[in-house]
């Protein structure tokens, strides 16, 4: 989309998503200079759009460009006419041409995106806070958690990014790589929803961070901490925010004994784009020296075919497209491959899933 189209982009966004004005202001002051927006028009009127927000993911220490798909919207008068399909087809074409391994999104309804090859790859742990002080009182009984909390500012963005990459890189197999711009955006985003990013110190050492938003209720969107510190951050947050009903999202932490609702909820769906790039990211049986896959992709025809993967120490050393499948080639779809790689579907012979995943972005 061109700069002169942004008024129409904002109109369609609000018609479809009804965000608080403060959040819409954040998004349209921040993201259009960083992302790509594809749109369809009829008689100069924008009727459908898709936003492609760039991120860098890290898988076992290998960083790669990826795209977070948001803002998929169609004017109510033009729905069920194939406009979203056209935009997704164009998206796949563009991102395949850039050799991006995968794209991902947070679905309003997974059934909308399953026909396009998207499958769940990440579930998020949550604690639902009670309307009264139940959890806050339970945790405050533990006493002083021994941490000091500070509200982060843009001047802290670089330190936050370096710390988060160190924390996540030591514990997660797949996560969103963060830089100064990432935290500039997150600080603006949380502030637009009445929240903030907190930095937790023990003495002079940064040991954890938390990001929350707060309207009528609050939502702790993310807790990051070095091993052993998550419960103490939860104690601090519950003690300071526990008088308001809300939600905490974080790595798993025992909440059953406090009598609060908790569990995992599906959050992110992923889709393979450039298959050969994706295969180079995967984990394989360390004892194997090769694997042959015969792959089917109903939408990206270039991904169809047979591929021989030379394996060394459980990683792909070389990926070769074959003219004909070898004997013993494993027949898979891109959907099966995506789910097996992220441990969300049936296991596939020879492929070891990523176990610890952390993809928490909203936009």
List each language-model region with its residue ranges:
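Amide-forming acyltransferase catalytic core, primarily the GNAT-like/NAT-type
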Residues: 124-239, 251-255, 272-287, 291
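Conserved GNAT acetyl-CoA-binding A-motif
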Residues: 88, 93-107, 242-253
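Conserved active-site tyrosine of GNAT-family acetyltransferases
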Residues: 113-118
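Short amphipathic alpha-helix that is part of the acyltransferase structural core
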Residues: 1-54, 61-68, 135-180, 215-218
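Active-site/acyl-donor-binding loops of N-acyltransferases
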Residues: 119-138, 224-231, 235-363
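Conserved beta-hairpin
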Residues: 36-50, 194-213, 353-354
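Conserved acetyl-CoA pyrophosphate-binding loop and the N-cap/start of the following alpha-helix
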Residues: 78-90, 228-237
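Conserved acetyl-CoA binding element of GNAT-fold acetyltransferases
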Residues: 64-76, 216-227
């Amino acid at each position: 989309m061109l700069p002169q189209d942004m008024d129409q982009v904002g109109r369609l966004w609000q018609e479809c998503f009804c965000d608080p004005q403060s959040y819409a202001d954040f998004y349209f002051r921040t993201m259009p200079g960083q992302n790509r927006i594809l749109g369809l028009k009829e008689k100069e009127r924008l009727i459908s759009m898709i936003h492609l927000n760039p991120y860098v993911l890290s898988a076992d220490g290998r960083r790669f460009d990826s795209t977070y798909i948001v803002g998929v919207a169609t004017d109510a008068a033009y729905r069920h006419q194939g406009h979203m399909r056209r935009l997704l087809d164009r998206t796949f074409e563009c991102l395949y041409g850039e050799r991006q391994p995968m794209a991902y999104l947070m679905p309003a309804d997974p059934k909308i995106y399953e026909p396009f090859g998207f499958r769940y790859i990440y579930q998020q742990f949550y604690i639902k806070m009670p309307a009264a002080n139940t959890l806050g009182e339970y945790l405050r009984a533990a006493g002083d958690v021994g941490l000091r909390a500070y509200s982060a500012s843009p001047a802290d963005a670089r330190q936050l990014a370096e710390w988060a990459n160190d924390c996540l890189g030591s514990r997660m197999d797949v996560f969103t790589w963060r830089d100064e711009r990432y935290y500039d955006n997150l600080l603006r985003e949380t502030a637009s929803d009445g929240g903030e990013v907190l930095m937790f110190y023990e003495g002079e050492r940064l040991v954890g961070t938390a990001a929350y938003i707060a309207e009528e209720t609050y939502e702790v969107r993310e807790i990051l901490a070095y091993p052993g510190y998550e419960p103490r951050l939860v104690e601090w947050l519950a003690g300071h925010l526990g008088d308001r009903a809300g939600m905490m999202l974080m790595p798993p932490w025992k909440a059953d004994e406090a009598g609060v609702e908790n569990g995992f909820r599906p959050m992110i769906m992923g889709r393979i784009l450039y298959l050969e790039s994706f295969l180079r990211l995967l984990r394989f049986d360390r004892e194997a020296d090769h694997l042959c896959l015969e792959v089917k992709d109903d939408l990206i025809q270039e991904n169809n075919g047979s591929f021989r993967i030379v394996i060394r120490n459980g990683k792909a050393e070389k990926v070769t497209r074959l003219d004909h499948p070898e004997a013993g080639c494993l027949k898979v779809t891109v959907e099966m491959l995506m789910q097996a790689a992220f441990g969300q579907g049936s296991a596939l012979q020879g492929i070891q899933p990523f176990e610890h995943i952390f993809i928490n972005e909203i936009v």
